[in-house]
Amino acid sequence: MLLFIDTANVDEIRAANALGVIAGVTTNPSLIAREGRDFAEVVKEITSIVDGPISAEVISLDAEGMMKEAVELAAIHPNIVIKIPMTTEGLKATRACMEKGIKTNVTLIFSANQALLAARAGATYVSPFVGRLDDIGQDGIGLIYDIADIFNNYDLATQIISASIRHPLHVQQSAKAGAHIATVPYKVLLQMAKHPLTDKGIDAFLADWAKLTPKA
């Protein structure tokens, strides 16, 4: 399973990329708004940092408007993937993008039926929101299992991006459930690298080494 970082903060993206584990970036209007910068400027800078898929989301609600934005965003860099909301208008735009060779990431997926529709419309990726489903008492990881089963049954090429990741266990569970990618906040990425027994082991090694070091 690949790891993307879910942020529009270029400092976080640079730091994550330096770890050598990030294969792409997902953004959305809310994340970019937090940065207080021009949308296209932020997206262009991100493409200069990470050599992989960069998801940038449209804000129009009609298919025609989505397509206009998609063409403009795709022109920024070949790695741009257009994030499109899971609506009937979004499905139309997804199909139109596919026909133009523009990669898409259909977002705000909360059911296997939605994922199937997006795949049939030609989506490159679908993004089921694990954490938001958990928030309302539903099984977010169970949805990843369901989508993976359906896609595998019919050899669908659309890849699953496990999104709305809240903690490291979501990442582990997503990998077991068959997600192709998990897109994680920077904080969660750092948490994945930590374990108290690792820290304890390092402290023990250093203490033992200090015993071998001659005192002045």
From Swiss-Prot:
The pathway this protein participates in, as annotated, is:
Carbohydrate degradation; pentose phosphate pathway; D-glyceraldehyde 3-phosphate and beta-D-fructose 6-phosphate from D-ribose 5-phosphate and D-xylulose 5-phosphate (non-oxidative stage): step 2/3
Q: Where are the transmembrane segments?
A: none
Recite the UniProt keywords alphabetically: Cytoplasm, Pentose shunt, Schiff base, Transferase
The positions flagged as active site in the entry are K83 (schiff-base intermediate with substrate)
The gene name reads: tal
Q: Which organism is it from?
A: Desulforamulus reducens (strain ATCC BAA-1160 / DSM 100696 / MI-1)
Q: Which SUPFAM superfamilies match?
A: Aldolase (SSF51569)
BP term (GO), one: pentose-phosphate shunt
Q: Which reaction does it catalyse?
A: D-sedoheptulose 7-phosphate + D-glyceraldehyde 3-phosphate = D-erythrose 4-phosphate + beta-D-fructose 6-phosphate
Quick check: keyword Cytoplasm in the entry? Answer: yes
User: What is the protein named?
Assistant: Probable transaldolase
User: What Gene Ontology terms describe what this protein does at the molecular function level?
Assistant: aldehyde-lyase activity; transaldolase activity
- Does the keyword Manganese belong to this entry? no
Give the PANTHER family listed for this entry. TRANSALDOLASE
